[in-house]
């Protein structure tokens, strides 16, 4: 029998040993189990805010699933619900609140930000939210509203051209709008590297440290370029420590998680996990249409919805390429002196690799083949039934989707009835283990792989 109260006490004790006190209080103190369904194994958990919900789904859910399996030998399905309460902008999220420290003396006005290079278009007002970025956007708004308190550091990761820099700079714009004398430092990681090297050559290390360690908000883009640079990592570690201890906000972006950056020191990996690590994934069709609509409005273009829909359906990789496709359509319309319509868009984008032709193996195909192999149905694979004859095929289908396509974990979860990415991760890990110990599972996976790779 699964004793929810005892399990929760055990899980909390485990997490308390893995998180520092500030992080533990932030993520666990006000999070409570609500109910456990013994038939579906659904565990409902109450969290304080939408961002906390996203953090649990992305960062803690896998630990919760593994702990439940170790505790009771069962697979649970966590469901996170937001408790009614104040929004992040009005609540005081940490208990106890850190005591304000005296401000270090510094010149007033814009002296510190005169060299800042923020793109004036990268504001929250211009950011289009969708399923792939709503958690990151919510976290960025919370950080802009309460810098240095809760999601510190904020680590945004994802592919090229998905809006990481936009969100990061939006935080900077909002801080400067509210505090014109704030010291906001925005840099590419390569700039930090070059500044550090030059400070050694010119013996100006004190000036270098003054620049970075007295910031109110430090924004570091593409931090993966710190990979394999031990001296740079050492310097950034001390910069991080100084800012964090002074309760100053740190925001970083990367194309991957800290744990996936080659030779990134363990202490940096650990500190980057103190706050919130949040992924941005490629926009879905609805979001892509909204992005194009916003772009068309800003450029004064008259484009009907069907044409926007067509252009959006041709590019599903990133926002940069999506907007590039619209620019190409606009250019052809200008050259040919024609109105923009589907026919013109089709002609302008004819040399693009249409997404339908470039995706390769589809998750839907994997689901169909797996369902036929196990004599079940695709709706069952996407559903919530917990009987073994459906659970195992579902987990194998998720595993093969991960192995044979380039779909992200959240994307795979979406294709399996909207399951969160930690459920997919658990399924993939479980099948990977069983392949080594269970000849029946190994044989089934091998058969299916051969069928799908023909």
UniProtKB/Swiss-Prot annotation:
Annotated keywords: ATP-binding, Cytoplasm, DNA replication, DNA-binding, Lipid-binding, Nucleotide-binding
Compositionally biased region (Basic and acidic residues): 101-112
Binding-site list for ATP: 161, 163-165
InterPro entries cross-referenced by the UniProt entry: AAA+_ATPase, Chromosome_initiator_DnaA, Chromosome_initiator_DnaA-like, Chromosome_initiator_DnaA_CS, DnaA_C, DnaA_dom, DnaA_N_dom, DnaA_N_sf
Any one GO MF annotation of this record: lipid binding
GO CC annotation terms, alphabetical: cytoplasm; plasma membrane
SUPFAM superfamilies: P-loop containing nucleoside triphosphate hydrolases, TrpR-like
Main location class: cytoplasm
Record's keyword annotation contains Disulfide bond: no
Residues covered by region (Disordered): 88-112
Biological process (GO), any one: regulation of DNA replication
PANTHER family reported for this sequence: CHROMOSOMAL REPLICATION INITIATOR PROTEIN DNAA
Subunit structure: Oligomerizes as a right-handed, spiral filament on DNA at oriC.
Domain observations: Domain I is involved in oligomerization and binding regulators, domain II is flexibile and of varying length in different bacteria, domain III forms the AAA+ region, while domain IV binds dsDNA.
Name of protein: Chromosomal replication initiator protein DnaA
């Amino acid at each position: 029998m699964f004793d929810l109260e005892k399990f929760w006490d055990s899980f909390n004790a485990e997490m308390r040993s893995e998180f520092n006190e500030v992080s533990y209080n932030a993520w666990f103190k006000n999070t409570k189990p609500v109910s456990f369904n013994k038939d579906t194994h659904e565990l409902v958990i109450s969290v304080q805010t939408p961002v906390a919900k996203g953090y649990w789904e992305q960062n803690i859910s896998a630990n919760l699933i593994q702990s439940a399996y170790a505790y009771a030998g069962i697979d649970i399905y966590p469901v996170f619900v937001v408790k009614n309460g104040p929004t992040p902008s009005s609540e005081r999220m940490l208990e106890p609140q850190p005591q304000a420290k005296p401000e270090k003396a510094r010149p007033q006005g814009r002296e510190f930000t005169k060299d800042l290079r923020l793109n004036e278009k990268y504001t929250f007002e211009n950011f289009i939210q969708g399923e792939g970025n709503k958690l990151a956007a919510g976290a960025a708004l919370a950080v802009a509203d309460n810098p240095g308190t809760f999601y510190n550091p904020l680590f945004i990761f994802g592919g090229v051209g998905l809006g990481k820099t936009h969100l990061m700079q939006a935080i900077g714009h909002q801080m400067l709008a509210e505090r014109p004398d704030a010291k906001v430092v925005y840099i590419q990681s390569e700039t930090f590297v070059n500044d550090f090297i030059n400070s050694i050559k010119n013996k100006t290390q004190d000036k270098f440290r003054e620049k970075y360690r007295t910031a109110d908000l430090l924004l570091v883009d593409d931090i993966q370029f710190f990979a394999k640079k031990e001296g740079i990592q050492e310097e950034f570690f001390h910069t991080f420590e100084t800012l964090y201890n002074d309760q100053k906000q740190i925001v970083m972006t990367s194309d991957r998680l800290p744990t996936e950056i080659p030779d990134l020191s363990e202490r940096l990996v650990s500190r980057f996990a103190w706050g919130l690590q949040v992924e941005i994934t490629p926009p879905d069709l609805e979001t892509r249409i909204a992005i194009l609509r916003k772009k068309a409005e800003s450029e004064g273009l008259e484009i009907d919805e069907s044409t926007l829909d067509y252009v959006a359906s041709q590019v599903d990789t990133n926002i940069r390429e999506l907007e590039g496709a619209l620019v190409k359509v606009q250019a052809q319309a200008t050259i040919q002196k024609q109105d923009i319509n589907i026919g013109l868009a089709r002609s302008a984008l004819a040399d693009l690799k249409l997404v339908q032709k470039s995706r390769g193996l589809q998750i839907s195909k994997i689901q169909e083949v797996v369902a036929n192999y196990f004599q079940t149905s695709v709706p069952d694979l996407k559903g919530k039934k917990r009987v073994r004859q459906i659970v195992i095929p579902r987990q194998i289908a998720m595993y093969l989707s991960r192995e044979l396509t380039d779909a992200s974990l959240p994307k795979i979860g979406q294709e399996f009835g909207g399951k969160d990415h930690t459920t997919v991760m658990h399924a993939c890990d479980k099948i990977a283990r069983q392949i080594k110990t269970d000849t029946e599972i190994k044989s089934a996976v091998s058969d299916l792989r051969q069928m799908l790779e023909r």
